[in-house]
Amino acid sequence: MPKYYCEYCDIYLTHSSPVGRRQHIQGRKHISAKIEYFQNLLREEGITPQNFLGFLGNRAFNNMLGNPMMNNMMPGNFPMHMKHGGMKHHSHYSRHSHRHHMSHGRYNRERHGHHSYSSKYHSHPMHMNSNSIGNPSGFSNGKYSGSFFSSPNAMHGNGKMFNNTIRDLVSNVNIDSDPVKDSQNGERVGDNAIDKVSSGMHDQGDRGDLGDHADHADHAGPVSATDGTANGNDQVSVDA
């Protein structure tokens, strides 16, 4: 079995087992050798604290891509054991996130708020059809003519959109054309007509009586009075 070579310390480990490697890496000599290695590398590259930020540009990115260890840690370039070994037990959150929001009617209303309705209306609580967008004929110029929905009573799905609206329309029609009220109004109109006819007949009778009195006065003779005289033209003069 080949021995493990430490490039920082420039030595071969006597015990190349994982336990021996871990003990060497955590040792004080290895840490000091590693610090000295990077100091020498920065000195060779001419990197100082003054130009360190400028070094982090494209040159640093290219050096990172040139390093095989850093290239393996780039997004989408995970090693095979990381793709299939280390991540097989971690599922993506978005694939199962909908499970946290689906109650399926198993929990009470007080505990889960708006997620407490049954699964029958969970995915689509409001089933809107093409007829629900327009205004009904009874509300074309009404209060709710400019709104998206026809009225607040029409916001129920599953074929029950316009039950309340139809009920309101029917009630309005019943109020406008009530047979009892129509019959009462008809009776009032008939009574008024009878009263008008009877009053007209009385007026005609009164006119007839006046005509009879006038004819009788025309055919009557001269009128005589104790204090006055009548001339030939039926003119009556009264002495003062």
Curated annotation (Swiss-Prot):
One of its GO terms (molecular function) is U1 snRNA binding. It comes from the Eukaryota. GO terms for biological process: mRNA 5'-splice site recognition; spliceosomal snRNP assembly. Residues 86-122, 175-240 are annotated as: Disordered. A zinc finger (Matrin-type) spans 4-36. Residues 178-194, 203-219 have a biased composition (Basic and acidic residues). InterPro entries: Matrin/U1-C_Znf_C2H2, Matrin/U1-like-C_Znf_C2H2, U1-CZ_Znf_C2H2, U1_snRNP-C, Znf_C2H2_sf. Its main location: nucleus. One of its GO terms (cellular component) is U1 snRNP. SUPFAM superfamilies: beta-beta-alpha zinc fingers. The keyword DNA-binding does not apply. Pfam families: zf-U1. It is found in: Nucleus. Belongs to the U1 small nuclear ribonucleoprotein C family. U1 snRNP is composed of the 7 core Sm proteins B/B', D1, D2, D3, E, F and G that assemble in a heptameric protein ring on the Sm site of the small nuclear RNA to form the core snRNP, and at least 3 U1 snRNP-specific proteins U1-70K, U1-A and U1-C. U1-C interacts with U1 snRNA and the 5' splice-site region of the pre-mRNA. Component of the spliceosomal U1 snRNP, which is essential for recognition of the pre-mRNA 5' splice-site and the subsequent assembly of the spliceosome. U1-C is directly involved in initial 5' splice-site recognition for both constitutive and regulated alternative splicing. The interaction with the 5' splice-site seems to precede base-pairing between the pre-mRNA and the U1 snRNA. Stimulates commitment or early (E) complex formation by stabilizing the base pairing of the 5' end of the U1 snRNA and the 5' splice-site region. PANTHER family: U1 SMALL NUCLEAR RIBONUCLEOPROTEIN C. This is U1 small nuclear ribonucleoprotein C. It comes from Plasmodium vivax (strain Salvador I).
